[in-house]
Amino acid sequence: IVGTWLAASKTIELEEIHRFGNEQKMMDGHLRWDFEALFNELKTGLKKAFAKYGDEIKSIGIDTWGVDYGLLDKEGRLIANPICYRDDRTKGMMDAAFQKLPKEEFFQHAANQFMEINTAFQLISETDLQRAERLLFMPDLFNYFLTGKCYNEFTRASTSQLLNTKTHQWDDVIFEKLNLPKHLMQEIIYPGTMIGELTAELAAEV
């Protein structure tokens, strides 16, 4: 989508540039998002936008659904395609979490609606944590492949059930009680934050 600011009417005009399908696929025993395919579609959209508007494009913003994430290894490579929130690996994980951190206390730290799809419960069942160096939520993952920069954007982080409601930072108690590696999490940034430019390689491609 290309958005054009119309100063006279103080409105934004939206134009669809590229549309594509997106379905979860069963890979390695789990329902996963085909990240490479999605990123290729994103690049196609950028190519179309730049072909039509060129230097008139002043910024790029990424938005996706919440709770799902990708893990990067020490070399900055995506370990595996992100597992979809509809995968059944989280069944029973919420009750398992409440054995370590009672529901009422949990809610005092992260006042989210309790759902098994939330990131906290996905991570309890995650098998790649030992290999992981960074966790990026879906929009953060696209931003990383666009710019090379690693951040966790606040609105997506807020769906994780790992963010303290009052401080808006990662909650030490939740990570400690659930035995989750807090070092995977990145600096929190807010919507509209400028994080960088397209990598030279990607800029040449699009």
Question: PLM features: what roles do these ranges have?
Answer:
Residues 1-35, 77-85:
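Short glycine-rich, Thr/Ser-proximal phosphate-binding strand/loop in the N-terminal lobe
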Residues 21, 43, 47-50:
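Short amphipathic alpha-helical segments enriched in leucine
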Residues 35-42:
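Phosphate/oxyanion-binding active-site loops and adjacent basic polyanion-contact surfaces
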Residues 47-206:
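Glycine-rich phosphate-binding/catalytic subdomain of phosphoryl-transfer
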